[in-house]
Amino acid sequence: MAALSLKGVRKSYDGKQHVLHGIDVEIADGEFIVLVGPSGCGKSTLLRMIAGLETVTDGEIAIGERVVNTLEPKDRDIAMVFQNYALYPHMTVAQNMGYGLKIRGIERTTIDSRVAAAAKILELEPLLARRPRELSGGQRQRVAMGRAIVREPSVFLFDEPLSNLDAKLRVQMRLEIQRLHARLATTSVYVTHDQIEAMTLAQRVIVMNRGYAEQIGAPVDVYEKPATVFVAGFIGSPAMNLMHGRLSDDGATFTVAGGGPALPVAGAPGIGAAIATGRDWVLGVRPEHMTPQPGVAQATLPVDSCELLGADNLAHGRWGNHDVAVRLPHADRPARGTALAAALPAHRLHFFDPETGKRAG
């Protein structure tokens, strides 16, 4: 195992326009980091640079005490798990897991021992004699993880490994990856566009956007205190409600743009200090914090639709020209046209600068 250090890492393909802009992060020995963001944000490019599959334009990547910028992938002491399982169809599970060690000249007894140990961890022992065509998608992905485990690397790199699996298998594999990391405690970098994977697997997440690391932090911190409008809108399902508007001179109300109502916001932390009154802001509040509750400031939301999500419901309406969603208990399913008393708890309100996108307060 080893720590992983990224200092000022940049990537450009033409020498002019950068696709990664000065990524700085120190990943502790044994830490599980998730790179999350939309397509084209640079997360997979960054992972490939760590792996040695892409060159580093500027900056430094170090694994342990070694700067690896110019090292070949085979010399970096890493193991990768890909979206595509990349299993040899003519080989058995055991042969697929041990093949990488075989071509490196590792002794047969060592290979057999490592394959047996990995198979036990991943519950693949009954499948060792089977070939890939005889396995389910989840089993194939476990074989791919087993192939990485037997290498006993300093760093695991996961490139959207669950993307090809159905929803039920993804849940199962998330749990298996959690258990695997708890057992091996190997430094891991995991790339995904799926925020549920990011929130459930990561010790820290790096939210990527247009080649920048928008925010780095523990999942709960990123969720509860998003640093930018982008993070606020990207992390969370359903997404945070974000509304442009103007904060009154006395800081008591926020008038939603597009003819929306004046929302009661008095008491929100930072108003009158970091959050200047009498100016435009972007107001954010999560749907689950707007569930009607006694003793909390409220505003009426005309309901135009309601989604049944199973354990709860999601009521939709509009304030001005902004769509607004409110999470409700399973038994509370308002009809179209209902006037819903949406809660606006002061300590759950977020204010963002409309020009910079950065959080205030």
Swiss-Prot record:
Molecular function as annotated in GO: ABC-type glycerol-3-phosphate transporter activity; ATP binding; ATP hydrolysis activity
Binding site for ATP: 37-44
Keywords: ATP-binding, Cell inner membrane, Cell membrane, Membrane, Nucleotide-binding, Sugar transport, Translocase, Transport
Signal peptide boundaries: none
Protein family membership: Belongs to the ABC transporter superfamily. sn-glycerol-3-phosphate importer (TC 3.A.1.1.3) family.
Assembly and oligomerization: The complex is composed of two ATP-binding proteins (UgpC), two transmembrane proteins (UgpA and UgpE) and a solute-binding protein (UgpB).
GO CC terms of this entry: ATP-binding cassette (ABC) transporter complex, substrate-binding subunit-containing
Alphabetical list of SUPFAM superfamilies matching this protein: MOP-like, P-loop containing nucleoside triphosphate hydrolases
SMART domains per UniProt: AAA
Record has Cell inner membrane as a keyword: yes
Taxonomic lineage from the root: Bacteria, Pseudomonadati, Pseudomonadota, Betaproteobacteria, Burkholderiales
Protein name (record): sn-glycerol-3-phosphate import ATP-binding protein UgpC
Stated role: Part of the ABC transporter complex UgpBAEC involved in sn-glycerol-3-phosphate (G3P) import. Responsible for energy coupling to the transport system.
UniProt xrefs under Pfam families: ABC_tran, OB_MalK
UniProt gene name: ugpC
Entry EC number(s): 7.6.2.10
Compartment(s): Cell inner membrane
Domain ABC transporter: 4-235
Keyword Repeat: no
Organism of provenance: Burkholderia lata (strain ATCC 17760 / DSM 23089 / LMG 22485 / NCIMB 9086 / R18194 / 383)
